[in-house]
């Protein structure tokens, strides 16, 4: 794809179900990877180190957003069903 400046745009990476599952499993245990581990995962999943790095960056942002939203749903003090504090 070419953008307005005539530059070729890089295509969006599509991950297979297997790759996504393996990346999610790794993320569950480690939100941050060492370079050595990133190389191992890239090799095992036939992806580049850069793809692994960016996937983890994006996943951390998603995790942060999810936890931020979850904490906003917690009421700081007990509310009665009528909207007044007890």
Swiss-Prot record:
Broad class of where this protein is predominantly found: nucleus
Classification via InterPro entries: Antp_homeobox_Deformed_sf (IPR050609), HD (IPR001356), HD_metazoa (IPR020479), Homeobox_CS (IPR017970), Homeodomain-like_sf (IPR009057)
Highest taxon of source: Eukaryota
This protein's UniProt keywords: Developmental protein, DNA-binding, Homeobox, Nucleus
Nucleus recorded as keyword: yes
Cellular component aspect of the GO annotation: nucleoplasm
Subcellular location as annotated: Nucleus
DNA-binding region: 8-67
GO biological processes: anterior/posterior pattern specification; positive regulation of transcription by RNA polymerase II
GO molecular function: DNA-binding transcription factor activity, RNA polymerase II-specific; RNA polymerase II cis-regulatory region sequence-specific DNA binding
Annotated function: Sequence-specific transcription factor which is part of a developmental regulatory system that provides cells with specific positional identities on the anterior-posterior axis.
Protein name: Homeobox protein H55
Lineage of source species: Eukaryota, Metazoa, Ecdysozoa, Arthropoda, Hexapoda
